[in-house]
UniProtKB/Swiss-Prot annotation:
It holds the Pfam family DUF2476. The lineage of its organism: Eukaryota, Metazoa, Chordata, Craniata, Vertebrata. This is Proline-rich protein 23D1. Belongs to the PRR23 family. InterPro entries: PRR23 (IPR018903). Residues 1-60, 247-270 are annotated as: Disordered. Residues 15-33 have a biased composition (Polar residues).
């Protein structure tokens, strides 16, 4: 009949709260244990993936000279060249010649030799280079500098054979400016490089005149004009020869007059000559 409403049994009224409790329990479990799916973070508007950017190196970060593990042995020779601005290094590899003028630190491995080219402005800066040794200057006697690599024994030599390293200063004597070692702060000390490496640093100056000479010449005094004494003044006007002198002035030479040229008349040959020499 219309308007009839079925009464709920006590069993149904007990089942409904139980279902509600199960729904709340499943929702709490879902919040505590989210599904193991890779969720991609999306932006609020574009929906693009948000990249993870690692910290970029600072401009003043140290540049280390750490070598690979297979090269860190006692037989490895390390050759360091310090370049000034505007200079270059020519490396001869048999039939190939490389011209190197880097703006930053450049490291080359040639057989058992490690060639490190360091610009001077990088080495002079406080945060430019890490090195466990003190660098000494070697000033070449020529402006251009060339190296030759021998593929047989793996050695690098100077092609001109004119660059000799300066000996360190003796105790009690101050070394000249160009012989003093380039001190590197202790903060730049880096572990991991064996001190047994043979480090031969070279400095190639662009203008050798900027470095002081080994034996400086004494300064040349500038000439200063001195006044002439009054008794030393003389004049050449009015000087005459003495009468007792054996020298006499020569008479003045006569002025050359006009030259007279006489006219020569040519007469015909005589008849007798014609008769004697007949054809």
């Amino acid at each position: 009949m219309y308007g009839y409403r079925r009464l709920r049994s006590p069993r149904d009224s007990q089942t409904e709260p139980q279902n509600d409790n199960e729904g709340e329990t499943s929702l709490a479990t879902t919040q505590m244990n989210p599904p193991k799916r890779r969720q991609v973070e999306q932006g609020p508007s574009t929906g693009a993936k948000k990249p993870s950017i690692s910290g970029a190196p600072h401009l003043n970060s140290y540049q280390s000279l750490e070598l690979p593990q297979n090269q860190q042995d006692s037989g490895t020779e390390e050759l360091m060249i310090v370049l000034e601005q505007g200079t270059e290094v020519r490396l001869s590899l048999e039939e190939v010649i490389l011209i190197l003028a880097p703006e930053t630190v450049l490291q080359l491995t040639l057989e058992n030799t490690v060639l490190v080219i360091v610009p001077e402005h990088v080495l002079r800066s406080e945060d430019g280079l890490q090195s466990p040794v003190q660098i000494q200057y070697i000033i070449p006697s020529v402006d251009d500098f060339s190296l030759e690599f021998h593929a047989q024994d793996g050695d690098i030599s100077d092609m001109r054979r004119e660059n000799v390293p300066f000996s360190p200063a003796e105790e009690g004597k101050a070394a000249p400016l160009y012989q003093q070692p380039l001190m590197i702060p202790q903060a730049n000390h880096m572990a991991g490089i064996s001190p047994s490496f043979l480090v031969t640093p070279l400095c190639i100056p662009r203008c050798r005149a900027a470095f002081p000479q080994c034996y400086p010449l004494p300064p040349t005094p500038s000439p200063v004009g001195r006044p002439r004494p009054a008794d030393s003044s003389f004049s050449l006007h009015g000087m005459e020869l003495l009468c007792t002198s054996s020298l006499r002035p020569m008479p003045p030479s006569p002025s050359p007059g006009p030259q007279v040229y006489h006219r020569v008349h040519h007469r015909p040959p005589s008849r007798a000559r014609r008769c004697l020499f007949r054809k």
